[in-house]
Amino acid sequence: MKVKVLVAAHKQFPMPADPVYMPVLVGAVKNYKAGIAYQRDDEGDNISAKNPYYSELTGVYWAWKNLKDVDAIGLVHYRRYFYVSKPHDLDHVAKGVDYEHFLADHDVIVPKKRNYYIESNYDHYVHAHPAEPLDKTREII
């Protein structure tokens, strides 16, 4: 099984060494700076310009449209990984063989449930995004 795990990033940052990980510069149409050698989400078929509205999903769209010969595509944030042991640092992130093992028996890998009571999903969203699209969606529903 060929697995690629996109590491969505908007800036240069330390990355895992395992080749299963593919750093993707999301919003590259705006975020690119000389010297960032990540796969850019503004190449090939892309929606990079929509990154302010879709965040890391512009990288997923890029992978969906442009990655070939891959059986499974994953997504992690440049500071949030799946770890196989402690301490939670780049030396202990899941490797390609770990993902293949997990996916042999499961269709999807997700993190442990997190109980987040500080604010609602709505409040959390509007702290980082314009409220209007979410408000319009609520109206329509």
Name what the model sees in each region.
Residues 1-141:
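ER/Golgi luminal nucleotide-sugar-dependent glycosyltransferases, focusing on the catalytic module
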